[in-house]
Amino acid sequence: MMTSSPPPNDLTTLQTLSEQELVKLDWQSLSCFSGELLELHAEGKLGNENFAKLPRKPILCIDQIELLDEHRIEATFQFPANQSEWPYDPAESLEMLFQDQLDQLVGFWGARKIKGIGRALSSGRCTLYQSLDFQPSKTLRFVLEKRKWMTSKEGGGTAVFNGKILDDADNLLLDTRNVIVGILNPTDIHDLRQRFGGKSGVAKPDVNEKISGLRIPVFDNDLGSVRSGDGKTISREATQSISPDLWPLRYHFRGDPVVPGNFGTHGMLALLKTSASEDFGLRNPVFKSMLKKSFSGMIFEDQKQIRFSLLNVVQNDEGDVVAKEARLFLENADGSKMIEDPIYTFKGLTVTEG
């Protein structure tokens, strides 16, 4: 029998409960979540073993959820005071890691309504206003407001939110419109695994492992640029090998390993930054914005490769470098396509001089 829930927004009470008490709570009825509750959810210990789970740290960068109700989500994360305690390389660009937290929060919201597995489907315009790189003790606030929730005849659902990342002085750091996450039937995910290479499984994280200096995977084979016949646009491709040893798969998600979609976005940005430097002369290209991204497939763990493809890359009047379109394809290890259509597409991916 479930115990009665603590009062809404009573993080103080939650933080006094033992693990044995926390696992007895009906997490789907709570309106706030301590860090320990989020970690238990990631491990499937809240009655969600066969359903949606949050990623484990270090992919999960949410310390607690202060508010989660029918219309709004508010959560926070604080960087550690010492760089040595931060698991990522301090020089790493992290805007896509933190945008991924918005997707995770929307999926978590939807999984309270339907017992399924959340997957990001798309998002609209995303704009970076200030750096999201490591800054000691800095606090980030994730604020999301619901636009709509739709259920399907098959039993799934789709949640749409607008999301922002703020600092503790309410300065806007990043905003994303129309974050869309679907809640899928677990059997559908199983079928996708069979079709797209998710049979190998991955090693469990070592609980005693000291994680440091992590880099988000980008690409391991830059195939270079091709200039159009009129010389006005550039296209560029690169590939990356996928195997069960790729580190993000150990943490995202337990029992359902998949490369985070926004890590693929990070790789596409890295290729655009390379083009901006080599093809257009930018000294320090950084992410500025994108108009839209869409996910129609997932990168599972079996040996394969992914292909990044930038199309119609130009420099605009402001000096920004823009990929009017970008696509990510799933390929077999020999370079033949697993499926003809791209599994990720991007519109208006833009970098600027940092």
Language model regions located:
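Hydrophobic/aromatic beta-strand elements that line small-molecule binding cavities or substrate pockets
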Residues: 63, 163, 290-293, 325-327
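Solvent-exposed strand-loop boundary residues in beta-sheet-rich modules
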Residues: 169-171, 332-336
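4′-phosphopantetheine-dependent carrier domains
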Residues: 113, 119-132, 137-150, 164-166, ...
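OB-fold/S1-family single-stranded nucleic acid-binding modules
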Residues: 120-123, 157-158, 162, 321
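Non-catalytic linker/capping segments at the edges of enzyme domains
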Residues: 2-92, 112, 133, 147-158, ...
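A structural microfeature
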Residues: 173-177, 339-340, 344
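Active-site helix/loop of acyl-thioester processing domains in fatty-acid/polyketide metabolism
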Residues: 65, 90-118, 258-283
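Hydrophobic, ordered structural segments
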Residues: 142, 159-179
